[in-house]
Amino acid sequence: MRKIRTIEMKRLTVEEFREIEKMPLVVVLDDVRSMHNVGSVFRTADSFRVAGVVLCGITGRPPHAEIHKTALGAEDSVSWRYFSTALEAVEALRSEGYTILSIEQVEHSTKLPSFRPEHGRKYAVILGNEVKGVHQEVVDASDGCLEIPQLGTKHSMNVSVTAGIIIYEFARELVFD
C-alpha cells in the first residue's frame, strides 16, 4: 500500500467548498470554553461538509489564533454565526426549519445507534460546556436528545470527540448511505 499524497487528494478550494451542497446539519456550541474544541469542531465540520457552526455565549469566535491552530483554516471554509445564548440560536434555527437535538444524557434520550435521521430534513445538534453540558433551558427547548452510549467509568467525552462521533453518524446515514 502507498499513502496518498496531499496533491493527489483533489481537495476543494475554500471558494469551491462554499458553493458545494452541504450536509443538512448545523453544530451549535453552547458555552464551549476550549478554543481547541472549537477549532476541532470547525475542522470536522469541514471534513464532512456540515452546513455550519453556531457559536453561543462564551464560546470563542474566529479570528482567534488558538481556534486557527486546530482548525487549520476550516474556520474560513465553514459558515458560522454567533448568538449571545444557545436559546436564541435554537429559536432562530427552529424558525429556519431545523429539528433541534441536544447531545446530552437525559431521561428518555435516544441512544445514537438507534437514531435514524430523515433525508430531506435539517438538523441542529447542540453540544454543551465541558463541565455543565447543554443548558437545561436549551434541553427543554429541544425536539429531542441524543446520547452516545458509553461503557467506561467517566460517562463523558471531550466536546470535539463527541462532535466527531455525531457528525460522522449523520454523514454515514445521510451522505454515505
Where are these regions (language model features)?
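Post-transcriptional modification and biogenesis factors for structured RNAs
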Residues: 1-177
